[in-house]
Amino acid sequence: MGSLSDSTPLMKDVQGIRKAQKADGTATVMAIGTAHPPHIISQDSYADFYFRVTNSEHKVELKKKFDRICKKTMIGKRYFNFDEEFLKKYPNITSFDKPSLNDRHDICIPGVPALGAEAAVKAIEEWGRPKSEITHLVFCTSGGVDMPSADFQCAKLLGLRTNVNKYCIYMQGCYAGGTVMRYAKDLAENNRGARVLMVCAELTIIALRGPNDSHIDNAIGNSLFGDGAAALIVGSDPIIGVEKPMFEIVCAKQTVIPNSEEVIHLHLRESGLMFYMTKDSAATISNNIEACLVDVFKSVGMTPPEDWNSLFWIPHPGGRAILDQVEAKLKLRPEKFSATRTVLWDYGNMISACVLYILDEMRRKSAAEGLETYGEGLEWGVLLGFGPGMTIETILLHSLPPV
């Protein structure tokens, strides 16, 4: 039997099918929705709250140290799905290392998809098309694991059609907002007519625990992380007059920094999600960020800008030190991280959902100020995810004018 060549009718049919399956244009962000739980705790009072609910007020010196950590975070307040009365029912969760994973999962398994669905409803409403037109769902969380997974539960809550193509991304941490955008780009561009609902939802009770003198890492995590969810509608070839694209997702790349996996790592144990971080996290990211930026520009045949201030910026706010050191390394003006610092102040670090909140903050402020594009009036920008591995997600965005 002879081999098939490109000239055979069958191969031509396959090539035609493949061409017809692909979209003509670049993936675009068409709508954004966000949601957060009702309980607000100010950062100024968080040390009092934290040491009270964990029955640790006798640890006077540790509390003073934790309060200093909180005051340096540049966070004003955070939202949580718990309050003091709620936590009184779970003394195992507020201990440092008592077995508590079952209780944490009992809270997160229904809570994560519900919060994600709340954000998704807002994105779908802004999009303005029927939810039956959603072809793909990508759901991301670090708030527990279960089967059927959170994507299934979110689709069920939203009433999406039963043949929606679902994807679930568990336990990726703080870089995952960029990861989900990378998935959404590939799905939208390789499936003609696809409309991808991407959802990131996080509940930090999976990692909440009492303070321990010999484990300051978890205390740092408790000073930073907040609860929240964000959803985007992503698709190529927008329908003129119906869909309103804001950003084109031009390129999406992931980079793992060699020999850095011990810088930030987390482990799911019987006592919940344990957080470990060294003081090298900010330097590790800032020392490698420029190479990632150069790579993403060169991969699409563009010359990297001589001045990084010519771009708009959506970096994940892993913490104040990370933002400060990246800003210094790239010689950025302070206002370039304005949207990120606003979200950090208003919500804290919401893990995977954070960069999507920042995208929302930027486009809303740009539109309100009457700027020429949703990207602070600029044409090109980058979205950056930082997290365990150490992993960097670099997304090259092209901003469009408000309509």
UniProtKB/Swiss-Prot annotation:
Site (described: Determines the polyketide chain length and product specificity): A207
GO molecular function: acyltransferase activity, transferring groups other than amino-acyl groups
Pathway membership, UniProt: Secondary metabolite biosynthesis; flavonoid biosynthesis
Gene3D superfamilies reported in the protein's UniProt record: 3.40.47.10
N-terminal signal peptide: none
Enzyme class: transferase
EC number assigned by the record: 2.3.1.-
Enzyme active site: C174
Residues annotated for CoA binding in this entry: S281, G318, G319, R320, A321
Function as written in the Swiss-Prot or TrEMBL entry: Catalyzes the iterative condensations of 6, 7 or 8 molecules of malonyl-CoA to produce various aromatic polyketides. Produces the heptaketide aloesone, the aglycone of aloesin, from 7 molecules of malonyl-CoA as a major product. Also able to produce a hexaketide pyrone, a heptaketide 6-(2-acetyl-3,5-dihydroxybenzyl)-4-hydroxy-2-pyrone, a novel heptaketide 6-(2-(2,4-dihydroxy-6-methylphenyl)-2-oxoethyl)-4-hydroxy-2-pyrone and octaketides SEK4/SEK4b.
Protein name: Aloesone synthase
